[in-house]
Amino acid sequence: MKAVEAEVEVKAEAEKKAKAEAEAKAKAEAEKKAKAEAEAKAKAEAEKKAAEEESVYRRRFNRHFDELRWLYMELYGNDSMFAELCDNMERFYHERSRSLKTSDYMREARPDWYKQNDMMGMMFYIDNFAGNMKGVQSRLDYIEQCDVNYIHLMPFLDTPAGRSDGGYAVADFRKVQEKLGTMEDLEDLTTACHEKKINVCMDFVMNHTSEDHEWAKRARSGDGEYMSRYFFFNNWDIPSRYEETVPQVFPTTAPGNFTWLPDAGHYVMTSFYPYQWDLNYRNPRVFNEMMYNFLFLANKGIDIIRIDAVPYIWKELGTSCRNLPQVHTIVRMMRMIGEIVCPGILLLGEVVMEPEKVVPYFGTVEKPECHMLYNVTTMATTWHTVATRDVSLLKKQLDIVNGLPKDYVFLNYLRCHDDIGWGLDYPTLAMEGMEERSHKKYLNDYFQGYAGNSTSRGELYNADPVTGDARFCGTTASMCGVEKAGFEQDDNAMDVAIRKDLMLHAYMFMQSGIPVLYSGDEIAQVNDYTYKDDPNKAADSRYIHRGAMNWDLAAKRTDKTTVEGKMFRGLHQLEEIRKSEKAFVSYADTWTIETWEKGVLCIGRYYDGDKIIGVFNFSEFDKTAWINETDGDYVDLISGRKMKAAGVNIPAFGYYYLKKC
C-alpha cells in the first residue's frame, strides 16, 4: 500500500514538475515572440526614418556643428580644411548602406543598446582563429554557441611582413592583409555577423603608420607635404629635447623615441618601433585623412572602433607627450563625427595608464568621448589577487570603478593579446609593507611557476635587467594551473585548476561593465611554445598566448568529462545566468561587501527589484565569508541551492551567485 502511495506521490510530483516546465517554456516563448514583434516594429520604424535621409543628416549635423567647429578651429584655425571635413562627412553618410543606416536609427532610439546583460565579447586573431575572414564567417555558429554577440577582430589591415608589430604597423588603412582576405570579404563577414546580431570590433591605429605607408614613402623621398605629416628633424637638437621628457615605450627592444634615416638624412619620431612613424596631428591634413579612414571602415560594417594607443597621439615639446589636452579634443571631435555620420558606431579607447589617467577618456556626461574603455588596472589587480590571495587591493579598485557614473562602461577581461604590465596601486600596497620592485619580482616569479605554491606557467616580456622590471605573458588556463596539471597528468589538480579558472570568469561577469573572453579561454587552451620556432616571432614572448585555435580540442567541448567540456559547460552556465538576470545590466547598482576574510571577495548587484550577491574565494583553502545580509532568503543561481547570505561557507576557489528570493 505504501509503495502504491509513494508511486502516486512521485507521479504527482513529476506531473507538477512537467506542468511547471511547460508553463515556464510557454512564458519564455511568449516573451521571445513579444521581443521579436517589438524588434520588427522598431526595424519598420527605422526603415521609414531611413527614407528621410537628408533631414536626418542635417539634424545630426546641426546638433554638433557649433562645438565641432569651435574645437577644430581652436586646434587648427583652418576654415578651408574644416569645410573639406564637413563635405566629406556628408559624402560618407550618403555612401553608407541602407541596412547600416537602419541600424544607426535603431541604436539612436536606444542609446543604451550595448549596456544590456546579453552583451558578451570575444577577441581573436583572424588567422589563428579560422585562417582568414571567410573562415571566421564559417565559424559564426561556434561563436554563437559561446554566447558571444561581439567579436573583436585583432589587427587585419595591410602590414609589411616581418615588421608588422602584430598588425599595428599599418601600411594601408583601406586594404586587408592578403592572407586574411579582402575588403569585400570584410563586408561579407560583417553582414553575416549582423544577420546573427553579432557586433564587429576592429583596431584603428591612430598614433602611427608603417614606414611602408604611402605617406611615409613620399616623406622618405623628401616630399615636404608628406614630411609634415610626421615628425622629421635634420639634426639631433630638437629630438634630444624630446628625449629629456618623453618616456620610452620599449626601453630594451626599441630604445629611444627617434630613428635616424640615412637615406633621408633626417630623424623621424618613432615612439614604438623604428618602423612605426608617429603621425603629426598638428597638421589638419593628418586629422582629416584619418577621419576619412575611420568613416570608410565604419561603412564596411564595423560596429566598434578600438582606438589604439590613444594617449600618445598629440606631441608637445617639454611634456611627456602622453594624455595631453589636445588628445581629448581629438577624441571628442571623433565622437561627434561618428554621431553625425554613423551613430551606431561605438568608440573603444585603449588607455594603458594609471587609473586616474584612464577615466578622463570617457569625457563628461555632457561632452562624452569614448563609449567604452578597457579596465586594464582591474585586470592586473585581479592577477595580483590570485598571487597574494588577498582581495583588499582589488576591493578598493572595484569601489573606485563602482563609484563612477553609470554612463561609463568598462570592458572587463582576464587575458588579451597583450602582456600583463604590473601597473598596480603601489602607494596603497606600500602601506601594507609591499615595495614596488620586489613585489613585481614576486608576481613575475609566481606566474612563471617559481614560487613554491604556484601552479602557473608563462614567460616574461621586455625584461629589463637593470631595473628588474618585466611584463608577463600566458593564457588564463596556464596561469590557473591547467597546463601544469595536464603535463603532470594529475586529475585532482586539473579539477582545482578548472574551478579556479571558472571562479575568475564568474567574478569577471559580476563586475560593472561588459565581459570579454580571449579566444581559447572558453576551452581552457594553454600556452603555445611553438612561437620559438618562428624567427619572426621568437624574440616576442607575447606569442606564447597568441597560439592558433585548436579545433580538435574545441570538438571535445560537448563531452562533459573532458577539460574542454568542463570549462565550456561551466562558462555557458555563467553566461546563461548573466543573460537571464536583469541585475547584470551594465547600469545596475554595483558595490563590494566586506567579508572579513582576506581571501574572499563579495560583490553586490541591484536593478529593478532584483538583487544578486557574488561570493568568490581566491584561496586554495575553504573559507567563510562573514557577510550578514538580513533581508531574507537567497538561492544560489549556480547550484539551485537555497542559502542564507550570512556566514557563507565557500570551498577553495569556489563561487556563488546568490539571488534574493
Q: Predicted segment positions?
A:
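Long, low-complexity, compositionally biased polyampholytic IDRs enriched for Lys/Glu and Gln/Arg
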Residues: A6-A46
